[in-house]
């Protein structure tokens, strides 16, 4: 019995010593491990964890194309952006960077990097993103043009500004890609007022072309329906009165042979290109000028050249047949006014007289018939 107890005691002692040795070994192994992962960015990390690295000056990486991708983010610039002010986290856009070390960066060029990242905008701005899918920019991108504008090209990335910025900044955004058009626009009656004077009443690029569903001349209905774009401002009586401009321009255009044909196209064949001029064909597209500007396409000295774009055989007197956008009056085209007035009086008088003659003649015939019947009766 004593021998059995001694054997059990020795066995238990061996187990205790073995367990202690294993525990000590585990403790030693743990002490040799690197710092816990809680010290590096994890899913749900805040912006300060990202900026701890990405606010370091000169942070960059080389791409396979040989381009340098700068990774330093200016803290104040981001915090003053619309996203920074709303407290959005970096990882809401950079979803593939939620863990550290980061996943391999797949972009080969800086442009590829932008194309990979801009689609994250759709997570919060789905309706705006969907609108871009029908734009000329998106169609160009789908056609293989990687330089076509995407969200971040216009709005920026870490410096997104709120939409209440001065309207005069809009043309400068478009200028990044459309510099030649911008140079024409800034000298036009619209552009000089907006860019040079800060006048908020004149149209910027997006007022005519749209914001996210940007349209342009490559879209046939855009040209056909462009008079309606011009009419938004030029039929606004309050706005036009402010600048002493007539609101008759649309009505006089529609009453003209050119405008009548365009309206028929709009109603009957909206997908077909019209063979008649619209506003921009005569006044210019981005280079519209004041009517008394020597560079204006519709000033008297230049009008023949404008007409000859469609009427190559037009003579010097040809433009005189056009009433411009004036309604005939004693001041403008008095001869046409008097002819028009004459027919306004003459035609109702003739038709009215004929109508009275028919009525009197018919009445007389009925009365004569009644008299004959009474006489024979």
Language-model features: where?
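Short sequence/structural segments immediately N-terminal
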Residues: 3-11, 19-377
């Amino acid at each position: 019995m004593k021998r059995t107890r001694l054997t059990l005691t020795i066995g238990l002692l061996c187990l205790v010593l073995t367990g202690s040795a294993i525990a000590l070994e585990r403790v030693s192994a743990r002490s040799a491990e690197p710092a816990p992962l809680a010290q590096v960015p994890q899913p749900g990390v805040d912006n300060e964890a990202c900026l701890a690295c990405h606010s370091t000056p000169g942070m960059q990486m080389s791409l396979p194309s040989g381009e340098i991708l700068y990774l330093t983010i200016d803290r104040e610039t981001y915090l003053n952006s619309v996203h920074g002010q709303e407290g959005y986290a970096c990882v809401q856009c950079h979803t593939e960077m939620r863990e550290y070390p980061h996943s391999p960066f797949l972009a080969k060029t800086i442009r590829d990097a932008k194309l990979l990242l801009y689609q994250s905008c759709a997570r919060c701005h789905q309706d705006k993103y969907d609108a871009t899918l029908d734009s000329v920019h998106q169609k160009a991108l789908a056609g293989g043009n990687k330089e076509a504008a995407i969200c971040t090209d216009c709005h920026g990335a870490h410096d997104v500004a709120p939409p209440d910025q001065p309207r005069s900044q809009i043309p400068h955004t478009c200028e990044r890609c459309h510099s030649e058009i911008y140079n024409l626009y800034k000298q036009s009656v619209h552009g000089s007022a907006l860019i040079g004077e800060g006048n908020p009443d004149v149209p910027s690029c997006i007022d005519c072309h749209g914001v996210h569903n940007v349209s342009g001349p490559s879209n046939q209905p855009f040209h056909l329906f462009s008079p309606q774009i011009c009419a938004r401002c030029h039929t606004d009586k309050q706005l036009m009165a402010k600048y002493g401009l007539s609101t008759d321009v649309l009505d006089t255009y529609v009453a003209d042979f050119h405008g009548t044909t365009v309206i028929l196209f709009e109603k009957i064949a909206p997908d077909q290109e019209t063979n008649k001029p619209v506003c921009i064909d005569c006044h210019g597209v981005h280079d519209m000028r004041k009517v008394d500007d020597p560079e204006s396409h519709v000033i008297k000295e230049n009008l023949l050249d404008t007409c000859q774009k469609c009427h190559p055989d037009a003579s010097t007197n040809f433009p005189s047949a056009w009433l411009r956008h004036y309604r005939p009056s004693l001041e403008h085209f008095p001869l046409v006014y008097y002819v028009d007035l004459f027919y306004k009086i003459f035609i109702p008088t003739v038709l009215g007289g004929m109508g009275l003659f028919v009525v009197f003649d018919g009445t007389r015939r009925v009365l004569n018939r009644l008299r004959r019947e009474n006489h024979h009766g």
